[in-house]
Amino acid sequence: MNLGFRTHSEAQDILKIYGIYIKIILLVCLPAFSATQRAPEFQVKAAFLFNFSKFVEWPAKSFSTPYDPFIVGIYGNDPFGRFIDETIKGETALGRPMHVERVRNVQDAVKCQILFINTPGKTAEILKTVKGRGILTVGQDPNFCSMGGIIRFYKEKDMVRLEINVQAAKESNIDISSKLLRISKVYR
């Protein structure tokens, strides 16, 4: 039976990405359901930030030395609290230890591989500054992708969804896996 996949490998890839998506949902939802509460939105977003490292390729210039850590930066108000630290603690990306940094200025922002920007009124300015530097920019402003951001979180039917600006990724020399693009809305 052919379900529209060109190859068996493509079908396996799709199942793998949906498997990860389901694991994220179960990971954050099951404890909450046992307490008759919903999983905090930012716990889900923290899991996404971690998993982006598995579906994105960065340019070689993203790291100064072979020993640099993989940095997930939070610029501006930190909505994640302990969730992002717990999610990243002890993990690796691209064979490098992952670290979370609360970024306070653009000089520190350019050291990040993933940069979550939560600075109302300053987002466009920050995006212009980090453009083309091999940084995966992530935000939740409704206009994030139109301002040049790469991945935007948004909610639809109480679910966290993704919108991806492929052109902005290309301009930053970031390659986003087709597996991630399949579960996202592509900004045009």
Please annotate each region the language model reported.
Residues 1-2, 29:
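Short intrinsically disordered, low-complexity coil segments enriched in acidic
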Residues 2-19, 34-188:
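Short hydrophobic alpha-helices and adjacent helix-cap/hinge residues
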Residues 18-32:
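Bacterial N-terminal signal peptides
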